[in-house]
């Protein structure tokens, strides 16, 4: 029998699980790190089980869901950052998040029924309420004809 106590009568220390008793313990690696994600795979898996969405939850389900949530968060944050930069701000506020979501076709469709607190509304003026463009052009043309400089410049030559 060897000295580690793995003989017929000897037992391994509790929690040794496949390594020699008293050997160096490997550092634990989270499933988020293994998947290369920032979002917590373990916590999402716990929520899936606790929520009773199904009797059984596969091992890949929380990893996939964490990846999808991380992608959506990154997409919204990137667009909100662009909106903040467009408004010459360094900090993202709820208004920037709303502008980012509502101006993006796919995110707008996904989050159509979502209300964002302190987000405000999209700037929108009904075209009927805007002044007529033809009236503006006619008024501008009329002003040009009555301008004294223009009239002086187009005087006929004396013969």
From Swiss-Prot:
InterPro entries: Histone-fold, Histone_H2A, Histone_H2A/H2B/H3, Histone_H2A_C, Histone_H2A_CS
SUPFAM superfamilies, per database record: Histone-fold
Primary residence: nucleus
Motif SPKK motif 1 boundaries: 147-150
Superkingdom assignment: Eukaryota
GO MF annotation: an example: protein heterodimerization activity
Pfam families associated with the record: Histone, Histone_H2A_C
GO annotation, cellular component aspect: nucleosome; nucleus
Cell compartment(s), UniProt: Nucleus; Chromosome
Sequence ranges of Gly residues compositional bias: 1-10
Short sequence motif named SPKK motif 2, residue ranges: 155-158
Transmembrane segments: none
UniProtKB keywords: Chromosome, DNA-binding, Nucleosome core, Nucleus
GO biological process: heterochromatin formation
UniProt subunit comment: The nucleosome is a histone octamer containing two molecules each of H2A, H2B, H3 and H4 assembled in one H3-H4 heterotetramer and two H2A-H2B heterodimers. The octamer wraps approximately 147 bp of DNA.
Family: Belongs to the histone H2A family.
Its biological purpose: Core component of nucleosome. Nucleosomes wrap and compact DNA into chromatin, limiting DNA accessibility to the cellular machineries which require DNA as a template. Histones thereby play a central role in transcription regulation, DNA repair, DNA replication and chromosomal stability. DNA accessibility is regulated via a complex set of post-translational modifications of histones, also called histone code, and nucleosome remodeling.
Name of the molecule in the record: Probable histone H2A.5
């Amino acid at each position: 029998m060897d000295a580690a106590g793995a003989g017929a009568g000897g037992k391994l220390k509790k929690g040794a699980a496949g390594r020699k008793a008293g050997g160096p313990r490997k550092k634990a690696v989270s499933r988020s790190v293994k998947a290369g994600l920032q979002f917590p795979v373990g916590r999402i898996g716990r929520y899936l089980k606790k929520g009773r969405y199904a009797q059984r939850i596969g091992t890949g389900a929380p990893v996939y869901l964490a990846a999808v949530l991380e992608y959506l968060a990154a997409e919204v944050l990137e667009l909100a950052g662009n909106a903040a930069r467009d408004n010459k701000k360094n900090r993202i506020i709820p208004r920037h998040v709303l502008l980012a979501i509502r101006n993006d076709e796919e995110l707008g469709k996904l989050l159509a029924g979502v209300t964002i607190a302190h987000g405000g509304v999209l700037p929108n003026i009904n075209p009927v309420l805007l002044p007529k463009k033809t009236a503006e052009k006619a008024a501008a043309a009329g002003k040009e004809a009555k301008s004294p400089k223009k009239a002086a410049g187009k005087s006929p030559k004396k013969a």
